[in-house]
A protein has these predicted regions:
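Catalytic cores of glycan-processing enzymes that make or break glycosidic bonds
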Residues: 1-189
């Protein structure tokens, strides 16, 4: 399985001048579209692609993903939807790959304890039938929730398998220095 990061760029991408100091002044350009994937499929037998469809996703990006038949990504930290009454819901399409989190966001324990406010934590705990004062149980239940979904495949980062807190976070986008240092030292615990 190959995960294509920034799949949206195959539909349209943000072009900037190579000499620009920031990416503010650019414009959208059409990407290669479905023709690129048709050529890939001619060259590679049993091509198995996951479209990373996170970020600015337009109807055109979704159409390209669907026309190609590729599953998209659903990250539970991002796709739990809180309504105005602070109730939570989620819908996971069958043609998707579900992640509890990715290398670019907090661990599930860290997400629950640091990234959500009290009403959101209460709503997630209620959804998972777990106690909000037990973040490791919340993590385990979210993993179970992922496996019970309609998704084609579930991917759980090792930090969530072990119910580790934010000290085990892999990467904080836009920062330097402390990223990519986490290592699994002992799987037995």
């Amino acid at each position: 399985i190959v995960r294509l990061d920034h799949f949206r760029g195959f539909e349209a991408y943000w072009e900037i001048d190579g000499k620009a100091k920031t990416a503010v002044n650019g414009c959208w350009r059409k990407g290669p579209g479905k023709a690129f994937f048709e050529e890939m499929e001619k060259s590679v037998e049993n091509l198995s692609i996951v479209a990373e469809d996170l970020g600015i996703i337009t109807d055109e990006v979704e159409k390209l993903r669907d026309d190609c038949g590729y599953p998209g990504m659903k990250v539970l930290h991002f796709c739990l939807n809180f309504n105005e009454m602070r109730r939570v819901g989620i819908a996971v399409p069958e043609n998707s790959i579900v992640y509890t989190g990715t290398h670019d966001n907090n661990t599930t324990v860290g997400w629950f304890t640091q990234d959500l406010d009290a009403p959101e934590r209460a709503a997630v705990a209620e959804l998972l039938n777990a106690r909000a004062d037990r973040p490791k149980d919340i993590c385990d239940k979210l993993v179970e929730f992922a496996y019970a979904s309609n998704a084609r495949l579930v991917i759980v980062p090792m930090q969530d398998v072990r119910a580790l807190d934010s000290r085990s976070r892999m990467n904080v986008p836009g920062t330097v220095g402390i990223n990519w240092r986490w290592r699994l030292k002992d799987f037995a615990h």
